[in-house]
Amino acid sequence: MTEVARLQSFLRAVASPGRTVVEAPPFTAFLDPDDALRFVNYSIPADGAAPDAAAVERLRTVFRKHGRLPRLEWIEQAAPLVARALVEAGMREELRTPLMSCEPTDLVDANVGVEELTVAPVGEADLRETADLQRVAFGDTPLAASDEPRDPRAHGGGAVLARCAGEPLAVAAWTPIMDGVTEIVGVATAEPWRGRGLAGAVTAAGARAAFAAGASLCVLSPGDDLAQRVYARAGFAPVATMLHWSDPD
């Protein structure tokens, strides 16, 4: 198995726990039954997939049936023909970003411009604050009082939360470890505290915790060039290209 195939297999496997999995060949949809947030609902094409217009429309039907925006996330090198079919079907590219990886010996602790900062594993009492910080940072609204926050610790994942004087400032999570691989996800910093090195600090802390839990390789996808530079300073380097596509809102 090539490194790209290994990483795509990992991303497919780690998407399954806690989600409704629906096959729509050559796609597999991973749908959160409790959260319509676009970034936690997506599909992954089979390696080497070459879908036609009918296949894309079947995928759309699956997402719409579940009240979710049709989306895809995959490694370009694993299925390079998919993007052409999506263009022809009227979908759009949300994001093209490097897939970056880091091994334990690569990890670098970040310098942080915040005094009295604490970074600790997320526990039961932190779940709502963690979820709200991530949602607001990604342009969504806080959870409704009746909504239960996702627990990043479910199925063997985890998260770390940075605080100052009790105030939650930044968070990073990691997915369940599969064959020694985990993904750092949900890295978010509260808007007033950005630009102080917190994203790099929680990324490094999350990766270190994942390595301690048994991972031998951490991967992540930066949202933009600035994030890529932040993660590079923490020891991550590009290995492939991640594509994020969706229907227009």
Model-derived features with residue positions:
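N-terminal charged segments
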Residues: 1-65, 78-79, 83
